[in-house]
Amino acid sequence: MSNSIVIQTSSTVIEDMKQQYKHSLSPKTPQGGIFMAKVPSCTITAYKSGKVMFQGGRAEAEAARWQTVSQTPKTAVKKSVDSHRYAPPASIGTMSIVGSDEVGTGDFFGPMTVVAVYVDAKQIPLLKELGVKDSKNLNDEQITAIAKQLLHVVPYSSLVLHNEKYNELFDKGNNQGKLKALLHNKAITNLLAKIAPTKPEGVLIDQFTQPDTYYKYLAKQKQVQRENVYFATKGESVHLAVAAASILARYSFVKQFDELSKKAGMPLPKGAGKQVDIAAAKLIQKLGKERLPEFVKLHFANTEKAFRLLK
């Protein structure tokens, strides 16, 4: 029997949901709707009124992932994602900062990696000389070359959430936004302990959700970093600490990805496009469906598409 659950939430959470389900979005949106997404055994429809409907066999489980962050006021002023009390000061680019960033969240294959890096203000010219900039503008070869030098120059904390653990935590009701928040907080906490008694002038997180939502995700954590913590989208262009974190996170991700390809005995593509569906179908044929959780993020729509290719 098909279940149907409706929750009332904020526009911020709905934006988070849309980002979370971006690989499963339906081209059709009902009247008054913001988006419709179809994941295995559940259809999610978000409306401009703030209501979100979950329909299907997994409606209850899927809705539960969002109910913990949905208790926010119904009325919200529409503003820029960077318009909040956690915005960094104008002078942050010249300060001694811990920066954090993540890689792998949009890839079906491979883990999620988060890195926090401490950059002393005196090191900024050196990092520029090494070619540190937004990792999206660098190829894997350049990433490797710069990362190998960075590892000996800056203190850092690197965390890898492997696929099996990722899927296990996701099945327990943790959406991707929450997993990112947990890893960022942990990497920053680890790094602050590592560099003590040195205290950075601030912490800059490459913003992936509204700061208030980030802290809601961390509500049950014993240690949460709040002192001089700032959030900014495109953090790599705000401070080189985030750019360095992005490079080290991608370096770690590429290494993990190569290991995963060796384990699979076949090259695995990055991203979440059609080539990924084909590779996943081949992997299922080769190793069996029970091994799939070791390689992929199961909640992506690619899982269903891969199985469809095998029919």
From Swiss-Prot:
InterPro entries: RNase_HII/HIII (IPR001352), RNase_HII/HIII_dom (IPR024567), RNase_HIII (IPR004641), RNase_HIII_N (IPR024568), RNaseH-like_sf (IPR012337), RNaseH_sf (IPR036397), TBP_dom_sf (IPR012295). Endonuclease that specifically degrades the RNA of RNA-DNA hybrids. It is found in: Cytoplasm. One of its GO terms (biological process) is DNA replication, removal of RNA primer. Coiled coil: none annotated. GO terms for cellular component: cytoplasm; ribonuclease H2 complex. It is an enzyme of class 3 (hydrolase). Keywords: Cytoplasm, Endonuclease, Hydrolase, Magnesium, Metal-binding, Nuclease. HAMAP family: RNase_HIII. Manganese or magnesium. Binds 1 divalent metal ion per monomer in the absence of substrate. May bind a second metal ion after substrate binding. Pfam families: DUF3378, RNase_HII. The gene is rnhC. A divalent metal cation binds at D101, E102, D206. Its cofactor is Mn(2+); Mg(2+). The lineage of its organism: Bacteria, Bacillati, Bacillota, Bacilli, Bacillales. Residues 95-311 form the RNase H type-2 domain. This is Ribonuclease HIII. Transmembrane segments: none annotated. One of its GO terms (molecular function) is magnesium ion binding. It comes from the Bacteria. Its EC number is 3.1.26.4. It comes from Bacillus cereus (strain ATCC 10987 / NRS 248). It catalyses: Endonucleolytic cleavage to 5'-phosphomonoester.
